[in-house]
A protein has these predicted regions:
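N-terminal accessory segment detector
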Residues: 1-107, 118, 123-136, 141-144
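Well-ordered mid-protein domain cores that form the structural environment of catalytic cofactors
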Residues: 110-115
Length: 144
C-alpha cells in the first residue's frame, strides 16, 4: 500500500474532511469499500504466500519509503512492528501545519488491513499504535 510521499498529508486531510462532512460511520464504510475494491489481489497473495509473504510484503513497502520495522513470522502468523512509519516521516517532512496524522489516520490501517486479512483467511489484530509513527499488528491464520 505504499503511496507517493507527498500524498500522505493529503490522506489525513481527506479523512478529516470525509468524517466532518459525512460522519465517522461513513468514513469507516469508505475504508471498507477501499479494501474490497482495491485489495482482493493482495488478499489472495497473503492467502497463498502465508505469513512469510505477509512479512516480506510489509518489509518491502516500509523500507521502500525509508521507514523502519521489525517482522516475525511463523507458520501461523506474521507480526509487524513499524518503528518509524513512512506515513509519519513524510507528513512531518512536507507538513504545512494541516496534515499531521491523527488516530483516525491509523485506524484506516486497522480497518483496511483487517478487511484484507478477512479476505485472506486471517484474523487481524492491532497491537498498538500512536500518532508518532509507531504501529504493531499481527495477522494470524484462522482455524480451519
Amino acid at each position: 500500500m505504499a503511496a507517493i510521499r507527498e500524498w500522505y498529508g493529503g490522506y489525513s486531510i481527506i479523512y478529516r474532511w470525509f468524517e466532518k462532512k459525512f460522519g465517522e460511520d461513513a468514513l469507516y464504510e469508505y475504508w471498507h469499500f477501499v479494501a474490497r475494491e482495491v485489495y482482493p489481489d493482495l488478499a489472495k497473495k497473503f492467502q497463498e504466500g502465508g505469513p512469510a509473504y505477509i512479512a516480506a510484503y510489509f518489509t518491502e513497502i516500509i523500507l521502500e519509503d525509508e521507514g523502519k520495522l521489525t517482522v516475525t513470522a511463523d507458520k501461523d502468523s506474521a507480526t509487524i512492528e513499524i518503528l518509524e512509519c513512512p506515513d509519519h516521516i513524510w507528513q512531518v517532512y512536507y507538513d504545512q501545519g494541516y496534515s499531521m496524522p491523527n488516530d483516525k489516520y491509523y485506524k484506516s490501517y486497522e480497518t483496511i488491513y483487517g478487511d484484507i486479512a478477512e479476505m485472506a483467511g486471517y484474523d487481524f489484530e492491532m497491537l498498538k499504535f500512536d500518532t508518532q509513527g509507531r504501529l504493531k499488528f499481527r495477522f494470524t491464520k484462522k482455524e480451519a
